[in-house]
A protein has these predicted regions:
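ATPase catalytic-site recognition across NTP-hydrolyzing enzymes
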Residues: 136-194
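Catalytic micro-motifs at enzyme active sites that drive phosphoryl/nucleotidyl and oxygen chemistry
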Residues: 53-56, 115-118, 181-185
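Short histidine/acidic/glycine/proline-rich micro-motifs that form metal-
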Residues: 1-3, 134-135
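Short, conserved catalytic or adaptor-binding loops enriched in Gly and charged residues
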Residues: 26, 34-38, 118-124, 183-186
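ASCE P-loop NTPase helicase motor core
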Residues: 74-149
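The start of beta-strands in P-loop NTPase/AAA+ ATPase cores
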Residues: 65-66, 191
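Walker B catalytic acidic pair
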Residues: 70-72
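Inter-Walker segment of RecA-like/P-loop motor cores
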Residues: 3-65, 166
Length: 194
């Protein structure tokens, strides 16, 4: 849960302050949740360590119909995502509401199941949105300079982390190579013998 405290929980607390509505929320760390005081609706935070524990999550009031999975790229098994998506949110909800699972992530590998599922083979119930550092209103000049430096020094990482393009940002052994005829001059006195 420490990862939530330092990421999603902190982001939503920051948004409450930024929007000037923090007085409408009660935020607790144990259990980690946010309660919207006018309606008593809750935002609950859970880790993805055990998908079966999450699948049994429910709320005492209202409906559990929105799920946000931050850093969804860390879910390596699509079957685990399916278990969660098919069980939370669940149940009948009023007609003026809808069920939604939102996944946020950086597209670190074009071979990840997220690309195939949500970008290559979309259906009418899927909407995808891509953002990048150029349109991120929350970055300051220092942040932008980091991406500009990345653009010059690590183009592949810039394409993924900066521009939000699918790729493989890290881990290849040879980054600067091409296929072609070697440009090695051979003198006539050196003959290859087979």
């Amino acid at each position: 849960m420490n990862t939530h405290r330092d990421s999603t929980f902190a982001q939503l607390k920051w948004a409450q302050e930024k929007l000037g509505v923090s007085h409408l929320w009660q935020n607790t760390v144990s259990p980690m949740e946010m309660t919207y005081l006018p309606t008593k609706q809750k935002i609950i935070f859970r880790g993805f360590d055990d998908v079966l524990k999450i699948a049994s999550t429910t709320v005492p009031k209202g409906y559990l119909n929105f799920v946000w999975i931050e850093e969804a790229f860390e879910i390596s098994d699509e079957a685990d995502f399916d278990k969660l998506d098919l069980s939370v949110p669940r149940g009948k909800i009023p007609e003026d509401l809808f069920k939604q699972t939102t996944v946020t992530f950086n597209p670190w590998s074009e071979n990840h199941w997220l690309k195939k599922r949500f970008f290559d083979n979309t259906d009418e119930n899927t909407a995808t949105f891509s953002t990048n550092y150029l349109i991120n209103e929350f970055l300051d000049e220092t942040d932008r300079k980091i991406f500009e430096g990345m653009k010059k020094n690590n183009r592949r990482k810039y394409e993924v982390a900066g521009l939000g393009n699918w790729g493989i940002a890290e881990g290849l052994v040879y980054e600067n190579w091409s296929v072609g005829r070697p440009e090695i001059p051979f003198d006539e006195e050196y003959k290859w013998k087979c």
